[in-house]
Amino acid sequence: MMWKDLPTPCYVVDEGKIRKNLEILADLEQECGCHILLAQKAFSMYSLYPMIGQYISGTTASGLYEARLGYEEMGKENHVFAPAYKEKDMEELVQICDHIIFNSFAQYEKYKEMCRESAKVRKDKKAVSVGIRINPQCSTQEGHEIYDPCGYASRLGVTEEQFREDLLEGVEGLHFHTLCEQNADDLVTTFQAFEKKFGKYLYRMKWLNMGGGHHITRENYQIETLKKLIRYIRETYPVEVYLEPGEA
């Protein structure tokens, strides 16, 4: 079809460029043994999900409707995080999501039993894997503190002071998301701050999710720095590593 024949308005996607980016992400998965998830709030053109699913491990969502989209259109690993969940939404999320991440221990306590019993209502008969979002209180962003998850008075994630080791039973993963269109050196800085405060708990976990904001496919991205960090984590702690790039 010629450009002049396209119905307008419409979205036009360069499949070759998308595949080039996906190949970079797939190589990272294969070389380092990590898992890449599509952050749907950044890119949710579901007509491309079957193609994207050929290269990466799955999707991550910020609520029920994105979770449905990933479950129905890609059908691979399906993760979700939200600052708070409605009980009605949680009843469906435990059926369609593999990982559910809570913003606080209060939210986890509220839905712990529902997650624990989730195998009874899931097609795969496997219980949901539960995670807690962490605020490592390490800001690497400048100029827009109001949007910074580690900024003053942020309520995104659990700080070291708020962490409840006594409530870790049933928690299988930790998650932090602090970056926005940033390079690997900022991720290293963030992880080092996280490790200093929370690293001891990783020995009790099955996975670590380092969120999104990684410009992995950008030309000047420090890919070798990222690989070195992932290898260090996997060699030091008994956890699977997840990343959630969106724009990349």
Which residues are covered by each model-predicted region?
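Conserved N-terminal beta1-alpha1 strand-loop-helix module at the mouth
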Residues: 1-22, 26, 31, 35, ...
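Solvent-exposed, flexible loop/coil residues
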Residues: 10, 14-17, 22, 47, ...
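Active-site-proximal beta-alpha core segment in soluble small-molecule metabolic enzymes
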Residues: 34-207, 229-232, 237
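A broadly conserved detector of short glycine/acidic/proline-rich loop/turn motifs that flank catalytic sites
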Residues: 17, 136, 180, 214, ...
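Active-site anion/phosphate-binding pocket segments in diverse small-molecule metabolic enzymes
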Residues: 2, 8-12, 104, 207, ...
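Residue-level preference for long, well-ordered alpha-helices that form the structural scaffold
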Residues: 7, 14-17, 183-190, 222, ...
